[in-house]
Regions:
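Non-catalytic accessory segments flanking enzymatic or RNA/DNA-binding domains
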Residues: 2-133
Length: 133
């Protein structure tokens, strides 16, 4: 019996189930505006349980390779809360497109560095279980 309990304890300690981790990401995207030909830089943010699959999705939409500008990992609940806080803090600066749909893109009036620094501060001061990767 003791051997069985030791085996169960070992399984719990070594199988932390990383599949439950979720990811918060930032992506700095530059594009050329079709109307003005100006180069616009916006910051995209979001959450996913699979960074590779999410990256493939973006690449399929934009037609070129992308590189995350920042990624963090942690429990789903905390990752969702981090995203919610960013949406609330930058609510007035989220890009709104066709039919006034609001997207997880912070408009070009906010510098990427300001968004990244905001996320880093939140992670360091609010979310003990989220780590930068």
């Amino acid at each position: 019996m003791a051997e069985h309990c030791q085996h169960q304890q070992y399984h719990i300690m070594t199988n932390t189930n990383h599949s439950e981790d979720h990811y918060f990401y930032l992506w700095r995207h530059r594009y050329i505006d079709d109307i003005t030909d100006a180069v616009i830089t916006r910051t995209c943010f979001g959450i996913t349980s699979n960074l590779d699959k999410r990256q493939n999705g973006y690449e399929g939409h934009v037609g070129h390779g992308i590189k995350w500008s920042g990624t963090w990992s942690g429990p789903e609940r905390q990752i969702r809360e981090l995203e919610h806080r960013l949406k609330s803090a930058f609510r007035d600066y989220l890009f709104s497109g066709h039919n006034d749909a609001v997207y997880e893109w912070v408009d070009e009036t906010i510098a990427f560095e300001d968004i990244r620094n905001w996320v880093q501060w939140e992670v360091e001061n609010t979310f003990a279980d989220i780590v930068k990767i």
